[in-house]
Amino acid sequence: MNYGVEKLKLKYSKHGCITCKIRKKRCSEDKPVCRDCRRLSFPCIYISESVDKQSLKKIKADIQHQLISKKRKHAPDSAQKAAVATRTRRVGSDEQDNQVYLSKPLEDCISQKLDSMGLQLYNYYRSHLANIISIAPMNQNYYLNIFLPMAHENDGILFAILAWSANHLSISSSNELRKDEIFVNLANKYTYMSLSHLKTNEGSSACAKLGFLYSLAQILILCGSEICQGDVKFWKILLNIGKNLIENHVGKDVSRILTTTTEEPSLEERIIFPNFNSVVKYWLIVNFIYHDILNFNTTSFPIEQYEKFFQRDQNSLPSSANFIESIDSPIEEIDPLIGINKPILLLLGQVTNLTRFLQTMEQEEMLEHGDKILSLQVEIYKLQPSLMALEHLDDEKKFYYLELFEIMKISTLMFFQLTLLKIDKDSLELQILRNKLDSKLDKVIGTFLEGSLCFPLFIYGVCIQVEDMEKKIDLEAKFDDILKRYKCYNFQNARLLIRKIWQNEADGISEHDLVHMIDELDYNINFA
C-alpha cells in the first residue's frame, strides 16, 4: 500500500574510496584515509579519473583479496611459508599474466609496523606501481616476486618501497610543475627512515654476508624512487653507495657476484627465495647495470665486466647456480627493466664510456681510436633480438617487444652518430633515422612498454630541427600522453632538457657535442 511516503534511497558518493565502494558503504571522503578505513585498518585508496580500466580492475581485485584475508584465521606458519614458496616458483601462462600478482599476505608484524597511510602506500606499490614499472609478464615481475618478499624481512626495504609509492603519488598527471605536498612529505619521511635503517644495520655481523643483498636492494629501490620524483643529484649518490656495497662484498669485478660463495641462507630465506644465491643476485645486478648505463656518465664498473656477467658460460658457474641452463632462467626471461634489450644496453654503455674517454683527448689522439669507433658502429647495425624469451608469448606481445627492440636500436645508433661520429642532426641520415623512430614510438606509446621510452624520446627530441615546429608540438603531445599514465618525473626532466637545448639553438648557441651540452646545462638526469 502506498501511503504517499517515498522510500529514501541512500546515495553513494562517486568520489569515495575504492574500499568503501567494494564494501558498498558510504565513504566519509576524508583524505588521505576515510573514517571507516582508519577505524577498521583497511587499505584506503582514492582513484583519480586518469587511472585506466585495467589498473582499476587490478586495484579492486587486490583490495578484495585483502578484505577477504582479514576475515580468515591465519593459517599455520608452515602452511603459509609453503604457499609463499609455491607462489614464488610459479611459472604462469599467458592467462596468468593478466591476473593480479598476489604477494605474501600482510602479516600482523607488517600491519603493526605501519599506520593506515603506510598500508595504503604498500598496497599502491603492490597493486599498481610495481606493475607499471616492470615491462615483463606478471610472473617475471621481480619488483613483486623479489622486492616485496624482501620487504617482509627487512624494514629498510619496506620503507624504501613506501617512499617510492609516495613519490609517485605526489606527481600530478595534469600539471607538470605541481606536486602534492602531503605525499612529498611522506616520501621524505620514509626515505629518511629507510636510510636510517641502512646506517643502523650496515655494520651488523649477522648480516655481513647475505645481508648486503638486502642493503643493495634497498639502495636500488631508493634510487628508483628518486629518479621517479625527478631528482638530478641524490640518485647518483645512492648509485655510488650501491657500487661501494658491491666492491666491499664481491670485489672490484662485479661479474663475480654469481660465483662468489656466501653464507648459507636461512630456512626463511630458502622458503621465500629458492634460488637466493642466484636469482636475487642476478636481478639486483641487472637493476644496478640498467641505472648505471642510462645516465650518460662513465659506468661504475667496466663494460667488459657487465658483458661477462651476462655471458651464458655455464662452466663459470657453480653447480648451485644451475638455473642458468634452464630456458626459464632469469637470463632467458624478459627482464622487468630491459625486456630483450640487454645487448643494446651494453653497446650504449660502450658508446657513453668511449665518448667520455675521448673528451679528455686532443683531436690528434682521438684519431687513434677510429677503429674502435667503426667497430662499435658495425656492432650496432648487426644487433638482432633473441627470440628465445618470446617463444611463449602471443603474437601481439611479441610484436611490441620487437618494436621496443628496434626503438632502442635506432636510438642507440642516433646517439652514437651524434656523440662519436659528430654527425650534424640536420644531416639526411639522422633525419631518416628520426622519422623511422617517430613512427615506431607511436606504435608503443600507450602500451605496457611505454615506461621504457624516456631515452628514445630524448634522442628523438634532440634531433628535431630548429624550425620544425610541427615535430616539436608532436613531441610535446607524446610526453603529455605518456605522463597521463606513467607519471615518472624523469620523463619531465627529459622534456625540460630538450626544451633547454631547443632554446639554446633558437638563441644561436651552436653545440654539436651532445654529452658536453648536457654537462654545460648541469642536468644530471637518469633516463632509466
Swiss-Prot record:
Please verify whether the record's keywords include tRNA-binding.
no
Instruction: Extract the GO molecular function terms from the UniProt entry.
Output: DNA-binding transcription activator activity, RNA polymerase II-specific; DNA-binding transcription factor activity; RNA polymerase II cis-regulatory region sequence-specific DNA binding; RNA polymerase II sequence-specific DNA-binding transcription factor recruiting activity; transcription cis-regulatory region binding; zinc ion binding
* DNA-binding region(s), residue ranges: 17-44
Read off the InterPro entries from this record.
Fun_TF, Zn2-C6_fun-type_DNA-bd_sf, Zn2Cys6_DnaBD
Cellular location of this protein? Nucleus
Q: What is its main location?
A: nucleus
Q: What does this gene product do?
A: GABA-dependent positive regulation of genes required for catabolism of GABA (UGA4, UGA1, and UGA2).
What is known about its subunit structure?
Answer: UGA3 proteins associate in oligomers, at least in the presence of inducer.
Q: What is this protein called?
A: Transcriptional activator protein UGA3
